[in-house]
């Protein structure tokens, strides 16, 4: 196991300073979402070039910091067809970018049924779950071609909000290139806090062999 840090949890700096700063804090790997860590330009399909990937890879090599996860936090169940097409292309760009970067995992969350990507009760419906499975399947298929793992992170406010639903997604898509980012705090809400131990135990029971990354944090 290697302990890393999310790049956007470190004080902002340009990449040529950010990555050395991460190493200086004692970390040897990071979870980076380009849209959260690059402010000099807008990361997108057009700017996520092989050259940029190689530049970041060289910075990482020089500073002995691996990219453990490339974050892509976009809503695969956006109901707007045009925006959904754009989102799919961005996922594909992240997968290609990760393969050049030498990053094995593209991490994501599981979306909402609205354009605003916010909680509403319909996120927890069976229809929402099926929408997510249907829209995730071609993304995972694309990742298989590049040898990249797509890791989904269950979050209570989103479509995959329990460990049981996460297991359903894994079983439905049935690919070694689909795994889990497990953040136990993100599965909690005011209504289930008293069951936190049981929820964590159930997560390891149902998901253990498919967990690629664990997020650790305190909460209030």
Region spans (language model):
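Active-site acidic/histidine proton-transfer and metal-coordination neighborhood
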Residues: 16-17, 54-63, 77-182
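Transmembrane beta-strand segments of Gram-negative outer membrane beta-barrel proteins
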Residues: 1-3, 65-68, 88
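Glycine-rich, proline-tolerant flexible connector loops at the mouths of alpha/beta enzymes
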Residues: 31-57, 110-117
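Catalytic domains of carbohydrate-active enzymes, especially glycoside hydrolases
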Residues: 15-36, 100-105
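Acidic/histidine-rich catalytic cores of soluble enzymes
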Residues: 2-5, 30, 36, 70, ...
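Boundary/entry segment of secreted carbohydrate-active catalytic domains
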Residues: 1-13
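Short, acidic/polar
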Residues: 11-23, 85-95, 193-205
């Amino acid at each position: 196991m290697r302990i890393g840090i999310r790049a956007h949890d470190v004080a902002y700096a340009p990449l040529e300073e950010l990555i050395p700063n991460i190493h200086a804090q004692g970390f040897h790997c990071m979870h980076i979402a380009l849209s959260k860590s690059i402010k000099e330009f807008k990361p997108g399909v057009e700017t996520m070039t092989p050259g940029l990937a190689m530049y970041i890879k060289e910075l990482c090599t020089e500073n002995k910091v691996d990219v453990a996860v490339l974050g892509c936090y976009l809503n695969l169940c956006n109901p707007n067809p045009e925006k959904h097409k754009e989102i799919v292309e961005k996922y594909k760009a992240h997968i290609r970018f990760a393969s050049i970067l030498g990053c094995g995992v593209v991490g994501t969350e599981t979306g909402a049924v609205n354009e605003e990507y916010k909680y509403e009760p319909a996120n927890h419906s069976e229809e929402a779950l099926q929408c997510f499975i249907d829209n995730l399947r071609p993304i995972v298929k694309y990742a298989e071609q590049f040898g990249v793992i797509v890791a989904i992170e269950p979050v209570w406010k989103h479509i995959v909000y329990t460990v049981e639903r996460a297991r359903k997604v894994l079983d439905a898509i049935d690919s070694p290139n689909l795994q889990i980012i497990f953040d136990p705090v993100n599965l909690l809400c005011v209504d289930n806090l008293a069951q936190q131990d049981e929820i964590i135990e159930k997560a390891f029971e149902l998901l253990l062999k498919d967990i690629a990354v664990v997020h650790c944090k305190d909460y209030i």
